């Protein structure tokens, strides 16, 4: 059950401003920004800091679309002390507010009046998701040389102007929330280092005054370039406060994050596009860093709760309306279920990833999303989706995910109020940019997503709600093992050994890569010769190697695909199953293949043979990696 309209006034015991260093002491923030559906309430936040006198008496009002008594959402008279900023939080229901709207903040300070506005478009829908990618992560240089193999060299040579180009390209496809992955590079892990704030050796992506180390990149200040260009297009930038060390929420990490967050706010807080703070360290869904002992696991859980309680308090001293976001993976969430309520008290946005690659013996991606949604609802926090727009090559380098798979996830996970993707550089490429970051297929993904988005926007304008927009992609294919007649001339040519296990393992990988999920084996036998290790038929393949059917089943397990097993041919493709002898032989093949390949059936939910088309389906869970 989602939160009803509530009004809260939170006075934060902090230290901050009405004007100082070029930053206004009044800030209006919408969570989520820009576009939402009318199934999502709008979290309106006002932050006020008094930089001048001891106490300031203010009259604060919020209006919808115009300043009028009938459009008043909220009003109060507030006393704002110096060193004691004020946060006002108003939750607005949106069901009856479809269309383009404007939230108007009016703050009166005696005779002085300050007005700020924020646009919000509310889409008529019966689901929470907009089914579009509303933003993306941006690594100025990817943290892993292995994963970033195909694009890190390109990122290294990008200039400030080319970073501005990239921001324009993101805006072109509506990815208007930019999450800077990190502003320092330091490849360390919690529990594996003895770094302190003073001994930190990380390298900055911007001209930091805190530490001397600099990343060796062509751009002089890509952070400034990103923010300045985002200002021009009304975009929103989550500033990546990191990296101290992966998964590290210890007190030393907290102190480092405070110092870096303050420097980032001092240097860049005047930018209208500076939307909030993103803590780069990430966490497992269980919140315990996969520690081996109960004591260690509890320490990690306590660390992350204490970190965000203190970091939130610190950031509110500088910027009381700015949200804080963390990305966790979606795995092992039940293990952290008792810790999430305390964590989410001080975490505005949880943005988990990995739903498409859940491990065995865990929740499904959909179940994990539902559990996290309830936890966030109960805490009054926001749940966004970090959609992975990449896949792993065998060498663990990343490459663009097929657009069909991305569209599938955009339509499957419909509870998220905002969908961001990881990541834009090296995965998407605008063909009009002066530099291509990564492989040629990054351009294909950009153009494929652009077409999908245009269709969604067209449907919105036409009043079509929640049509599943895709090209009605092929979800499966038949597999022919024998060469039977001239029709197989091009599919199973004589010069190709279609019984070789390596051949089929490669083919199944290719089918998985292009988004196929179902495999239908046309025939497992022909002319009384079997393509599997039969006990009553001769082998149609060399007996000293794995059968093609075994190779197909193993590869299907590896890539999480589903196989419909054939029960023929008893003799050949002209089998007449009305003849008792043919029917008996096909049933014998069915029983034998069921016995041979039963280990490929999901042990939790064994599937029974399907009568349709004399085939049966083998279903198994996906085998996936646990890291991003």
Question: Which residues fall in each region the model found?
Answer:
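Active-site groove signature of glycoside hydrolases
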Residues: 243-248, 261-298, 525, 569-576, ...
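Aromatic- and acid-rich polysaccharide-binding/catalytic face
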Residues: 272-285, 335-363, 424
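Active-site clefts of carbohydrate-active enzymes
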Residues: 144-145, 245, 375-405, 485-486, ...
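Aromatic-lined carbohydrate-recognition surfaces of secreted/lumenal glycan-active proteins
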Residues: 238-251, 278, 308-336, 380-392, ...
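Aromatic-lined carbohydrate-binding/catalytic grooves of carbohydrate-active enzymes
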Residues: 175-217, 514-546
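Short, compositionally biased P/S/T/A/G/V-rich stretches that sit at domain boundaries
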Residues: 21-47, 327-328
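Catalytic domains of carbohydrate-active enzymes, especially glycoside hydrolases
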Residues: 156-187, 348-350, 419, 499-527
